[in-house]
Design a protein with these regions (language model features):
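Active-site mouth loops of central-metabolism enzymes
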Residues: 14-26, 124-137, 276-284
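Aromatic- and glycine-enriched glycan-recognition loops and surfaces
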Residues: 19-38, 59-83, 196, 402-406
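Aromatic-lined carbohydrate-binding/catalytic grooves of carbohydrate-active enzymes
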Residues: 36-72, 95-114, 118-121, 163, ...
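Short, solvent-exposed turn/loop segments enriched in Gly/Ser/Thr/Pro and often Arg
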Residues: 12-14, 44-52, 91-98, 155-165, ...
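Active-site-adjacent "subsite" loops/lids of carbohydrate-active enzymes
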Residues: 89-149, 184-187, 198-199
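Carbohydrate-binding surfaces of carbohydrate-active enzymes
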Residues: 3-5, 37, 42, 66, ...
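N-terminal structural segment of carbohydrate-active enzymes
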Residues: 1-53, 85
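N-terminal small/glycine-rich loop or linker at the start of catalytic domains
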Residues: 1-18, 113-125, 260-275
């Protein structure tokens, strides 16, 4: 059962020391009334902010001078206790302006030639190195907070491995006799340092109460280093759609978090853009959608706000949050304490690729997830520790070469009847350029041409055969006798565009003959000879999406657990609530539109009509109804397939199948 409260607010309070009269307008009743209006059952309040200011009388840090002795944190905690609202405590770990002003030598330095780790556009905030004496100070601050307040949870912010070249890190490398010119030595040290930090801070958090929750926030849960997730007692998936994460980041993050066995929540914001935006509001419909989306993935919710320095709560903000959480309160019983169902497993490039990704927006992972979301597939995201049991198809997007360890694991999976879909260089050995599985093809190298063309044997969108341009890297394959089907062909252009030879505005047209197979099938699955996931992430090419979907459909056949005619901007989950003897299909739909300079906005929530759902369940279904209003839905069940039709819904619906 759930331990984390389900409707939380993360109340930022990063407040400059140059502002006076801090908390002067704090009013306990107004604070409580806003929490009630917001349907909030937990609020994270501040002990220490990024500026290094403490919001209670502290012996280990600098109390904000503008408080003039007022213990704001204690006042907030008392207000929460009186109305039964949970109140974990926030401590800024990686940023502390006050400390760095006094100890500039403790700054983290990202490159040998730089003087600090740059965090644009947050001018003024600079990371502190955990190999400096600051870590002792931070630990003492945490110990003071838990001894004084005994909170149920501690949120430690700006905490993830950061490569650092400060004098403390250089000294460690030197003492170990390692090469200071080798960047990998500093990468390895950053991971070791983060573990040291986590071990010490976790011990401090639990020094009073071993059941105190702790979360270290780094803005993303890393599948590259999955062990780090377990430094936390739970996961808070920071994902502000308008703050740089985008609307498709949270579903990707939640699908991965669900595999780790920890409770998790989705963290969005009430802001039009991102953290620290005073006076910024998104449309209420956007926040309703984000709460519904979060809960549909089995996640609790947290909404970010920032309190005014004077300590009063913004009434409009809590009216906005209340609209979203009123809906969340109504649907949470059908979403939380559930297990997600899957047909497809995606091996994460972030975890499996030889080279680590350069950002959290890895094109190979982003592209394949977009295709699967838009195709309404049930899928999970897998790191190196994940089991492959139970998946009907495993997808290896673009750059997952096969180590001996992975080969052994995949062989076992294939022996049990599974199928593979590989794109790009996935499926090739790490030791030499050859396929390690039977896709009915031999690998012959990377194409010399870009772009190239795919000529499919299927009819994309009902169009007749043609040669469709693909801009991502293409790979040359040759058909083998074991090939069971060539599903598409590859064609080259007359030449690559150069100053010496070019044609028209873009690129040369295709030659009138095939280079060879573009998609091949063998006994182990299918291979697509382009970085097709990256193609979809970068260009949004409809042919790329259609190619992956059509290939998947041939592999999975009639074995899909659920089929639904939801539009491509929708999200679908199927969750099992075993203790309540039911399955719940969650359908969520809105269409973000870019407004301004790339900001995605949700304004209108469009009503959808005649949504048909077919679910294959092993149990006999007794009843089907809407979770939002408990109204009955007519259904049929034949050969295990339960068929039901929604005449209409707006934004979200939970379709409940009682067994």
């Amino acid at each position: 059962m759930s331990v984390l409260p389900s409707r939380q607010v993360h109340l930022d309070f990063h407040t400059s020391e140059k502002i006076d009269n801090i908390g002067s307008k704090f009013d306990k009743k107004q604070f409580q009334d806003c929490l009630k209006k917001g349907h909030i059952n937990s609020i994270t309040v501040f002990a220490k902010c990024h500026h290094g200011m403490m919001y209670y009388p502290s012996k280990t840090g600098t109390m904000h001078p503008g408080l003039h002795g007022f213990d704001l944190l204690s006042a907030e905690l008392e207000a929460c206790r009186e109305i039964g609202v949970h109140a974990p405590i926030y401590i800024s770990a990686g940023f502390d302006v006050d400390y760095l002003t006094k100890h500039p030598e403790c700054r983290a330095i990202s490159k040998p030639e730089e003087t600090y780790v740059k965090y644009p556009p947050m001018d003024g905030f600079k990371l502190i190195c955990y190999n400096s004496p600051y870590l002792d100070v931070l630990v003492s601050q945490i110990e003071e907070v838990v001894q004084k307040f005994n909170p149920e949870g501690v949120f430690l912010d700006i905490s993830s491995p950061k490569v650092c070249y400060c004098r403390y890190c250089r000294k460690i490398i030197e003492q170990r006799g390692l090469d200071q010119s080798d960047p990998q030595n500093f990468v390895d040290l950053s991971i070791e340092t983060f573990k040291k930090y986590a071990d010490r801070t976790n011990a401090a958090v639990k020094s009073v109460n071993k059941n105190t929750r702790v979360f270290h926030n780094g803005g993303n849960i890393s599948a590259r280093r999955p062990k780090e997730a377990f430094y936390n007692t739970h996961l808070e998936l920071e994902s502000l759609p308008t703050g740089g994460w985008g609307y498709d980041h949270f579903p990707r993050s939640a699908r991965y978090a669900a595999t780790l066995g920890l409770e998790y929540l989705g963290m969005t914001g009430k802001f039009h853009t991102t953290w620290g935006e005073f006076g910024g509001f998104k449309h209420p419909n956007a926040l309703i959608y984000e709460v519904a989306l979060s809960m549909s993935f089995g996640a609790k919710c947290s909404i970010g706000d920032q309190m005014h320095p004077y300590g009063f709560m913004d009434e409009a903000t809590y009216s906005l949050i209340g609209k979203a959480y009123e809906y969340g309160e109504k649907i949470e019983e059908y979403c939380l304490d559930s297990v997600q169902m899957y047909d497809i497993g995606v091996l994460l490039s972030e975890s499996y690729a030889i080279e680590p990704p350069k950002s959290r927006l890895n094109n190979h992972d982003v592209g394949i997830c977009r295709v699967l979301n838009e195709g309404n597939y049930l899928y999970s995201l897998l790191d190196k520790n994940a089991s492959f049991d139970g998946f009907k198809v495993l997808v290896l997007p673009d750059d997952i070469r096969i180590t001996p360890e992975l080969k052994e694991k995949l062989d076992k999976y294939l022996k049990n009847g599974g199928k593979l879909l590989c794109t790009g260089k996935s499926g090739l050995s790490t030791e030499k350029d050859e396929f390690l599985f039977d896709f009915g093809a031999e690998y012959a190298g990377e194409s010399e041409y870009n772009p190239t063309y795919i000529r499919p044997e299927f009819s994309p969108f009902g169009l007749p055969s043609s040669s469709f341009v693909i801009y991502a890297k293409s790979y040359v394959i040759e058909k083998t006798p074991e090939c069971t089907e060539v599903f598409a062909h590859a064609r080259d252009p007359f030449f690559n565009r150069t100053p010496e030879h070019f044609c028209s505005h873009r690129h040369a047209p295709f030659v009138d003959y095939d280079r060879g197979p573009g998609i091949s099938f063998g006994k182990d699955g299918a291979y697509i000879a382009w970085d097709m996931a990256e193609e979809y992430a970068v260009t949004g090419c409809m042919i790329a999406k259609e190619t992956i979907i059509q290939t998947l459909e041939k592999l999975i056949g009639n074995d899909k657990t659920i089929s639904v005619n939801l539009p491509s901007a929708g999200f679908l989950t199927l969750n099992k609530q075993a203790e309540k003897s039911r399955y719940v299909a969650n359908l969520v739909y809105a269409s973000p539109i870019k407004r301004g300079n790339g900001v995605e906005v949700i304004e209108e929530l469009v009503e959808l009509h005649d949504i048909e759902i077919s679910v294959k369940l092993p149990e006999k279904v007794k009843r089907v109804y809407r979770g939002t209003d408990r109204s009955e839905l007519a259904f049929t069940q034949n050969d295990g397939a339960v068929n039901v039709k929604l005449d209409k819904f707006t934004c979200h619906e939970s379709v409940v199948f009682e067994i």
